[in-house]
Amino acid sequence: MIGKTKKILIIGSAPDSVNATKWKNLSFDNIVTINNAWKIRKDWTNSIYPEDFPVNQRPKANEKQTLHSSDEYVEAQNHFGGFVYAGGTMAFTAGYWALFRFKPQIICYTGCDMVYKGEKTHFYGKGTADPLRKDKTLNNLLAKSARLEAIAFINKCKILNLSNIPESKLTFTKVNINDLDNISRINLNKIKEEKINLALQKEKKTGYFVPDGKYWKKMDKFEKKEIKIIDNLWLSSIQQEIEV
């Protein structure tokens, strides 16, 4: 007997995330919203945000909804190698947390392409582009995305991008939400396991692990060139056309 495919939707705050309001009869087991994205759909099940996210901007959960912050996601991110290698921004943190918490077969992203152009950078107007802040862990967003996709792969999970904007800092295969029921027909990225092994070995050897998750307090201990080598290994693990 074939088990049910567990699918998770992660919604970010990009301008196009509002397209998710039009989606009907969703077959996701959980809908995870990042920061303010809980405002997009009332049927979200999990709201995730950093510990410094303003209390007055957090949602009020009903009996079918739960709130999650650093007291949970630090453990999840550490399980998969820690923040320095994974990238210290919520788009990636939410993915690792969902992978750890739900052990799904499919994770779909929307509104998380991390492209900030024009006056309206978020669905609610102009916001802070957190992934573009000065941070050694975020110098190559494509590489951090490739890492998440590769780590999901070895955990028997596919990651897809439901956004339809032409530019993205995510490596995930773009699909139409109407095609999710025919996942076997989608031409997914090819994953190179030998490259994954090399990247994981390099991470272990480098040893940039901060147990409490507060990596920014030890930023001076991390060498840009070492992180770049690791990032390039992760990029090489995903076979796709990438515009850097």
Model-predicted segments: where are they?
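Metal-ion/cofactor- or nucleotide/acyl-coenzyme-handling active-site neighborhoods
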Residues: M1-V244
